[in-house]
Amino acid sequence: YQDSWKKVDIKKYKKFSNINLIGMGGSIMGSKSIYSFLKKKIKKNFFFIDNFEHNEINNLDKKKRLNLIISKSGNTLETIVNSNILMNPKSKNIFITENKDNYLRHLANKMKSEVIDHNNYIGGRYSVLSEVGMLPAHLMGLDVEKFRNLNQLIKNKFFLEGLIKNVKNIIDLSK
């Protein structure tokens, strides 16, 4: 991944201890997995909004939260609806979407919010090591360089062959 989000002054957003991640499927699933796996190390509260559970959404304090809205197309209906429910003119928002004419980009510009370009060659379910997963990881207080090292490890042919062999052995043992 490239740190396309580093051009945004992230320091001003690190003060938030409550962060809403709004998106669907792969746009937030990788970040949700990172948060679930490393929750004991993370001192912030992350809320993953990917459906229309209005009771949960309505109970969130809109003033003291950072909203991170993620949609590759920028036109995902559920993401748009949830964003409109959770945002207000004074809320702090960061949008990650393709650099194309889309609803969320228009909304971000109208609200004078930060916009980070979602790389158009990365699909949602494969995006955890891109800005879609690494910006939330950074806001969680995690060292994104360690993820970059993991990315290099995954590209290593011998590591992958060993991993596949071990997974196969584990599956065989579980039968």
Across the structure, where does each feature detected by a protein language model lie?
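Acidic catalytic cores of enzymes that act on phosphate-bearing nucleotides/polynucleotides
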Residues: 1-3, 9, 144-148, 156-175
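Low-complexity, highly charged intrinsically disordered N-terminal segments
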Residues: 1-19, 29-30
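Short, flexible, glycine/charge-rich loop motifs used to bind or transfer phosphoryl groups or to couple energy/partner
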Residues: 9-11, 55-59, 173
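Glycine-rich phosphate-binding loops that contact phosphosugars or nucleotide phosphates
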Residues: 16-159
